[in-house]
């Protein structure tokens, strides 16, 4: 990295010349050194079909660059113009009720429609040709927030592509029928063309149909990203990304497979700071070895016509920025620079108001810039320490849980809650996609992944055999790749590999079921598995409710390491304490060295450089915190010596400690 970026999303096409110049001047004063432009400007670039002119944006990029501000240019494909959509319902997105989306509000077109793909390729080619080699253009963003407002499309184009996808996957219809078990409810198909989309139906569609359609849709949107990236690379060497999210119906691992760096948006409040940190720990690993970007976060609050959050507490924005840079980000950017005077998001927080004055978040933006300048030399001379503990993250698992949410489960909430238990123990951690290598890790958690591929099981079991500890569950391994039930044993290949026998799987009632582990008794909930206590070493036993007397937490030696099966989810305060005790127990057994006793609400981001180990300590919750320094070190901000022992951190404060004897 050559610099840290501090930026904003900017829409010069919405403003007159005088306002644009005012914006650029104030950006320089604030310290904004990058902007993102163009993602919603298709009708400005091509007001009439076939009449494309991107000269305005060429001029803007040049003017910004002359003022020391670099640009990430976007393709404008979320917002096809009215000439594309008017009177052409076949080009539009159809939701699961087969309702056709109208023009406007963005993402109204079906991204699989062949005419959309054709026009998207033409506008992308024109932009890349004209702007691709400009000085000041440092990157490309494809589209914006794929599937933000929509999920799977049910139009006729998608139906045809769905049938093609099924043919490629199964070859002959008999294989599909066998794999899905379509004899249920007389659902057997005679041709691929008979397989429906999971649209309106009297009751629930078949699990296999619902999950496979989601996976099909995820592959289709990724193929659109591939197509756009390929076009841009013909005319530009600048790296390509997409502004993604874990909230949407996409497979981010697949989406970023052919892109150059990972980026996303997050609007986590101070009360939900763990979600902000989760994103940093995940997106750092989607393109390993490359810094990630936060392309959108609010300088104060998020809002639309129908909802609004509250402004951040003073200091929280700085804590977000410093923690993101410390955890591997190169860019920290706001949505948006100047409040929009019209549209659906006129009430959204911004850096400047629509009338050009500082907003409620302005002083916090200035604080971020002061912090960026202060820590930039440290960040540029170090890199994040390799974590020794990892947690598996899977967007494909999200599809399975969307199909089968049991009692209203949400994948994101499950993952965030489990992540918080690891975070609260002070362990430096990674969230890694299913396909990530396990080199360098000692401890692996794999919760909430209903289907585990054979490839993943082989990789994770090899990790355990070589000395790692693999903790799997809850809600893991109980479904096949087709979203059917195993017929050989409860958890299929996972059970066979671990050697731990599953006795029953059933929904535990946390008002009835309790279990005990690590000296803690807690309610148990979620769709659960209980295990034969003779097939492994029992660490947790169901004490009350169905399954009482059987193990819900058990381990078994596997080569030089262990496989641990967590069959149920401890809940409530006692459950959180039990899970954190589990994390600490196995972190000690795995000899995790990259950890601290930092108080909850404060984080330690360890970094390493030529001069050794650096801890960047940041308070996120606004309550202040502390951590024990294992040895003496130098505060790189004050240049004072800090002795080994307790280090206090004030509300939203950050400290940077270079250890004297640690490398």
From Swiss-Prot:
Enzyme class: hydrolase
Active site: 145, 296
InterPro entries: Beta_galactosidase_C, Beta_galactosidase_Trimer, Class_I_gatase-like, Glyco_hydro_42, Glyco_hydro_42_N, Glycoside_hydrolase_SF
Catalyzed reactions per annotation: Hydrolysis of terminal non-reducing beta-D-galactose residues in beta-D-galactosides
Induction of expression: Up-regulated by growth on type I rhamnogalacturonan.
CDD domains linked: A4_beta-galactosidase_middle_domain (cd03143)
Listed EC numbers: 3.2.1.23
Molecular-function GO terms, alphabetical: beta-galactosidase activity; metal ion binding
Effect on the protein upon substituting residue 145 to A: Hydrolysis of the covalent glycosyl-enzyme intermediate is slowed
Alphabetical UniProt keywords: Glycosidase, Hydrolase, Metal-binding, Zinc
Statement: the UniProt record of this protein carries the keyword Phosphoprotein: no
GO CC terms, sorted: beta-galactosidase complex
Gene Ontology annotations of biological process type: galactose metabolic process
List of residues binding substrate: 106, 144, 345-348
Source taxon at top rank: Bacteria
UniProt binding sites for Zn(2+): 110, 153, 155, 158
Family under the similarity heading: Belongs to the glycosyl hydrolase 42 family.
Quaternary structure, from the entry: Homotrimer.
PANTHER family registered for this protein in UniProt: BETA-GALACTOSIDASE GANA, BETA-GALACTOSIDASE YESZ
Full protein name: Beta-galactosidase YesZ
Species the sequence originates in: Bacillus subtilis (strain 168)
């Amino acid at each position: 990295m050559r610099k840290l970026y501090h930026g904003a999303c900017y829409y010069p096409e919405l403003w007159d010349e005088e306002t644009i110049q005012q914006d650029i001047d104030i950006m320089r004063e604030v310290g904004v050194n990058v902007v993102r432009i163009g993602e919603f400007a298709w009708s400005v670039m091509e007001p009439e079909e076939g009449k494309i002119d991107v000269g305005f944006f060429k001029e803007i990029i040049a003017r910004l660059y002359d003022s020391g501000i670099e640009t990430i240019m976007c393709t404008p494909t979320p917002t096809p113009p009215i000439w594309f959509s008017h009177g052409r319902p076949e080009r539009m997105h159809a939701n699961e009720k087969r309702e056709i989306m109208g023009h406007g509000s963005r993402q109204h077109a079906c991204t699989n429609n062949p005419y959309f793909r054709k026009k998207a390729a033409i506008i992308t080619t024109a932009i890349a040709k004209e702007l691709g080699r400009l000085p000041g253009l440092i990157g490309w963003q494809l589209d914006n927030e794929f599937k933000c407002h929509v999920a799977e499309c049910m139009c006729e184009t998608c139906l045809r592509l769905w049938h093609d996808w099924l043919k490629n996957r199964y070859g002959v219809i008999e294989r599909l029928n066998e794999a899905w078990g379509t004899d249920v409810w007389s659902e057997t198909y005679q041709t691929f063309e008979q397989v429906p989309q999971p649209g309106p139906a009297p009751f629930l569609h078949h699990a296999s149909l619902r999950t496979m359609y989601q996976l099909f849709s995820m592959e289709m949107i990724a193929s659109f990203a591939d197509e756009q990236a390929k076009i841009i690379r013909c005319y530009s060497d600048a790296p390509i990304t997409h502004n993604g999210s874990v909230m949407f119906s996409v497979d981010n691992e697949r989406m970023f497979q052919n892109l150059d760096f990972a980026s996303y948006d997050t609007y986590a409040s101070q009360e939900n700071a763990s979600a902000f940190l989760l994103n940093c720990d995940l997106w750092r690993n989607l393109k390993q070895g490359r810094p990630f970007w936060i392309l959108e976060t609010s300088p104060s609050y998020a809002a639309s016509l129908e909802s609004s959050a509250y402004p951040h507490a003073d200091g929280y924005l700085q804590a977000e920025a410093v923690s993101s840079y410390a955890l591997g980000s190169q860019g920290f950017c706001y949505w948006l620079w100047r409040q929009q005077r019209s549209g659906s998001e006129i009430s959204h927080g911004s850096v400047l108001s629509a009338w050009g004055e500082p907003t409620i978040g302005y002083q916090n933006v200035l604080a971020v810039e002061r912090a960026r300048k202060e820590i930039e030399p440290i960040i540029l001379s170090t890199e994040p320490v390799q974590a020794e503990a990892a947690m598996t993250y899977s967007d494909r698992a999200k599809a399975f849980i969307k199909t089968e949410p049991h009692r209203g489960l949400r994948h994101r909430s499950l993952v965030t809650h489990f992540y918080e238990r690891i975070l609260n123990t002070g362990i430096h951690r990674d969230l890694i996609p299913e396909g990530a290598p396990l080199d360098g890790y000692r401890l692996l958690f794999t919760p909430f992944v209903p289907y585990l591929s054979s490839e993943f099981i082989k990789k994770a079991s090899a990790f355990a055999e070589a000395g790692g500890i693999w903790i799997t569950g809850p809600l893991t391994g109980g479904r096949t790749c087709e979203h059917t039930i195993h017929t050989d044993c409860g958890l299929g290949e996972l059970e066979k590999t671990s050697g731990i026998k599953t006795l029953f799987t059933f929904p535990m009632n946390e008002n009835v079921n309790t279990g005990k582990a690590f000296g803690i008794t807690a309610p148990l909930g979620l769709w659960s598995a209980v295990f034969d206590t003779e097939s492994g070493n029992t660490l947790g036993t169901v004490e009350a409710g169905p399954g009482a007397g059987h193990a819900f937490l058990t381990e078994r030696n596997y080569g030089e390491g262990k496989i641990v099966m967590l069959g149920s989810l401890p809940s409530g305060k006692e459950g959180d304490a039990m899970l954190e005790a589990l994390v600490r127990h196995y972190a000690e057994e795995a000899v995790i060295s990259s950890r601290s006793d930092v108080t909850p609400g404060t984080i330690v981001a360890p970094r390493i450089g030529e001069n050794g180990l650096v801890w960047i300590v940041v308070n996120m919750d606004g309550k202040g915190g502390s951590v024990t320094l294992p040895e003496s070190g130098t505060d790189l901000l004050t240049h004072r010596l800090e002795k080994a022992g307790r280090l206090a951190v004030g509300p939203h404060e950050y400290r940077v400690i270079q250890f004297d004897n640690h490398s």
